[in-house]
Amino acid sequence: MKLVLIIAMAVVVFGISVSLISVQGQQNNVIPQWIKNNAGWWADDSIDDESFVNGIKYLIDSGIMEINIDTTIQDQGDFYLTYKPNPNSPYVEEDSAIAFLKNSNLLEQEINFLNENFRLPYDVEVLAQECGNANAWYDYEIKQIVICYELIDMDYENYIYFHNEDLDYAYETVDPYIYDNLDWTFFHEVGHALIDVYQLPITGLEENVADQFASLMLSYTYDENTGDYSIGQDMLYNVGTWFWISNELYSVNPDDYPFWDTHNLDIQRFYNISCYAYGSDPQYNQDLIDEGYLPEDRAYWCEEEYLVMERAWSFLLKDFDNGFFD
């Protein structure tokens, strides 16, 4: 334990992020004699703190002690996907939630993206299943993201109902609407997973932080052929629409609503996501202000709000990504 504390102290002094220290010529974790001597002299006050630290610094600078700073976490796990049957779907098989998921290839694509860009210390399952209610969550005990088929069904039904006066438009646009909101929901739960797996030191409500991560990920979505980022902006527009519709269909009764809940009200999440979209690209999203969806008083700070959010997540994940935020 004394040895670990000594090495840790030296590392902190030099400001080096260390995941692995290897000494030339030493194998199988054998502690070399020079470390024992140096540590012993320091522990016995035969040398002062400065001499001890300078000795470690010399070994690092001269290459005798090799420091691997390429990774601070080993990539020992992956996100992986499991589909469970969807026998109780209210729709025919080809229109079921599981069929939508599999045909869209959404989860497969995003899981590949995550595994390419982030290092996990262990596996995290993404489970698509029937839950008995419309929901999605991250299970901290078993390290599992759950996407419920009922959530997809509910999104479909609410969207069609909300646009019942123009069903042609509703049926034409419902699939991308569901896709975008499912994508955002998935990344929201991934945000929870990353906070847990990496033990990220967040401040504020975790639900809000997960909302920010999901919105940030969608804002990065672009057309690989043209480099057009408007795709991500349109996806955020659909997510905002999702919360707007939910607010309209499920009005809040102050006497019944659980204001103690960790989630913001749907209308608050609508304004937050609209702000993130505007902040990431004010010119493209000027219509949010022009059409009265985003008040100018909030929009004034949205660019800074987005940059703070981006810097925060970049800093939090700098030791765990493969250069995604570089």
Language-model segments: which ranges?
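Acidic, Ser/Pro/Thr-rich low-complexity regulatory regions
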Residues: L3-A8, G15-D75
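Sec-exported extracytoplasmic/periplasmic mature domains
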Residues: G40-I47, K57-M65, N115-R119, G191-Q199, ...
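A metal-dependent hydrolase signature that marks the N-terminal structural subdomain at the beginning
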Residues: D70-Y161, D168-Y171, W301-E304, E310-D326
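Pan-zinc metallopeptidase signature
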Residues: D75, L81, N253-D326
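Active-site-proximal beta-strand/loop segments in catalytic clefts of secreted hydrolases
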Residues: Q129-C131, C148-L151, F187, D196-Y198, ...
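Active-site recognition of the HExxH zinc-binding catalytic motif
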Residues: I147, W184-V197, E207, D211, ...
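Short pre-active-site segment immediately N-terminal to the catalytic Zn-binding motif
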Residues: I160, E165-T185, Y198-I202
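Post-HExxH zinc-binding segment in Zn-dependent metallohydrolases
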Residues: L205-L249
